[in-house]
């Protein structure tokens, strides 16, 4: 049914006519079932320079340490539960197991302190099994940590901390022990899931694949998925997908969005965001000053000294210019106009909040 050589020749001919704005199919969609899996584990980091957990406050660290020693035939004497270990820290370990990972391959891991360790710098992670959501062990982690931050403290109590010393990474620190079953080679169809569901993009993918391979090869399931017929032979399926994923697709225009972060003042504006005719915004500053006074009773009186609150409330309306825009004005033009008069990001966010109720022709997302 599928001739790989003919597909390659046809793809090369069609690629010359693709627009410069087009994107590869692999950049806008993923194959259903081809995904990474999260792994997590719990272990110990040893060899710390006195920056480990205070085990009197984190009993689980000491319990884990004792369990590890018991596996080597070492029994901790009774009554030593309050021993202080300064060079050991309990940590969580997590990693992403990439698709098609096989036993013997290595993956990067992230190690994070879960106790009160001050720093993991200089530590080594002991053998830690990494489990999936199904409870099976898929990898074994061990190795020396690479920590980007550090912590220093003087005798007078002054201290300095750079970045985050309580977390680190081990490149290639986990060895894969079990492969995750994949349904990639099952069935005679494959499903392409769009990273950003869009009906226009889904239709253009269907049209592009059918123009290349023939009618009915690709069918849109909905705005987020496209189902394509595929060879049954695994090697042909790989060649087939290598051609499909390099097809140039012109994606549909995304929905106009404005994203604002009220905590940081960050504003992200999408393309072609337009507003209706007029906008005006003023700046009102309300100042409340607390100036309590002390009421002192006279001598030999039965009165008591009391604090009497006294507040002054002052409202100031700054003389800000009125902004007026014509129909079809883009939000980018509004931002430039607001910035020219020296308005703060908070004023711009207030304008965007007001525009949300009617004139703003876009989705306003506040994070």
Swiss-Prot record:
<dbReference type="GO" id="GO:0009428">
    <property type="term" value="C:bacterial-type flagellum basal body, distal rod, P ring"/>
</dbReference>
<dbReference type="GO" id="GO:0071973">
    <property type="term" value="P:bacterial-type flagellum-dependent cell motility"/>
</dbReference>
<dbReference type="Pfam" id="PF02119">
    <property type="entry name" value="FlgI"/>
</dbReference>
<protein>
    <recommendedName>
        <fullName>Flagellar P-ring protein</fullName>
    </recommendedName>
</protein>
<keyword id="KW-0574">Periplasm</keyword>
<keyword id="KW-0975">Bacterial flagellum</keyword>
<dbReference type="GO" id="GO:0030288">
    <property type="term" value="C:outer membrane-bounded periplasmic space"/>
</dbReference>
<keyword id="KW-0732">Signal</keyword>
<comment type="similarity">
    <text>Belongs to the FlgI family.</text>
</comment>
<comment type="subunit">
    <text>The basal body constitutes a major portion of the flagellar organelle and consists of four rings (L,P,S, and M) mounted on a central rod.</text>
</comment>
<feature type="signal peptide">
    <location>
        <begin position="1"/>
        <end position="22"/>
    </location>
</feature>
<dbReference type="InterPro" id="IPR001782">
    <property type="entry name" value="Flag_FlgI"/>
</dbReference>
<comment type="function">
    <text>Assembles around the rod to form the L-ring and probably protects the motor/basal body from shearing forces during rotation.</text>
</comment>
<dbReference type="GO" id="GO:0005198">
    <property type="term" value="F:structural molecule activity"/>
</dbReference>
């Amino acid at each position: 049914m599928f001739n790989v050589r003919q597909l390659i020749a046809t793809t090369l001919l069609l690629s010359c006519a693709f627009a410069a704005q087009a994107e590869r199919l692999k950049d806008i969609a993923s194959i259903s079932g081809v995904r990474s899996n999260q792994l997590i584990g719990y272990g110990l980091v040893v060899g710390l320079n006195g920056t480990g957990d205070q085990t009197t406050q984190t009993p689980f660290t000491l319990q884990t340490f004792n369990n590890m020693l018991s596996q080597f035939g070492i029994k901790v004497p009774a009554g030593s539960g309050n021993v202080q270990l300064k060079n050991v820290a309990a940590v969580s370990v997590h990693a992403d197991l990439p698709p098609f990972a096989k036993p013997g391959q290595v993956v990067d891991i992230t190690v994070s302190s879960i106790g009160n360790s001050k720093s993991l710098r200089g530590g080594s992670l002991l053998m830690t099994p990494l489990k999936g959501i199904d409870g099976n062990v898929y990898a074994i982690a061990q190795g020396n940590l690479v920590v980007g931050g550090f912590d220093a403290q003087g005798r007078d109590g002054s201290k300095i901390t750079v970045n985050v010393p309580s977390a680190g990474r081990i490149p290639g620190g986990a060895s894969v022990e079990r492969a995750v079953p994949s349904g990639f080679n099952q069935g005679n169809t494959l499903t392409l899931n769009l990273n950003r569901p869009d009906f226009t993009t889904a239709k253009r993918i269907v049209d592009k694949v059918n123009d290349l391979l023939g009618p009915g090869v690709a069918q849109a399931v909905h705005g987020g998925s496209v189902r394509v017929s595929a060879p049954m032979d695994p090697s042909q399926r790989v060649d087939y997908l290598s051609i499909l994923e390099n097809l140039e697709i012109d994606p549909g225009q995304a929905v106009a969005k404005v994203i604002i972060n009220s905590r940081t003042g960050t504003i992200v504006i999408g393309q072609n965001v337009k507003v209706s005719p007029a906008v005006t915004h003023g700046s009102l500053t309300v100042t409340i000053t607390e100036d309590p006074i002390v009421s002192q009773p006279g001598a030999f009186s039965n009165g008591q000294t009391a604090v009497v609150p006294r507040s002054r409330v002052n409202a100031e309306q700054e003389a800000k210019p009125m902004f007026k825009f014509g129909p079809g004005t883009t939000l980018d033009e509004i931002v430039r106009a607001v910035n020219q008069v020296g308005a703060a990001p908070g004023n711009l966010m207030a304008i965007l909040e007001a525009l949300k109720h009617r004139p703003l022709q876009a989705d306003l997302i506040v994070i």
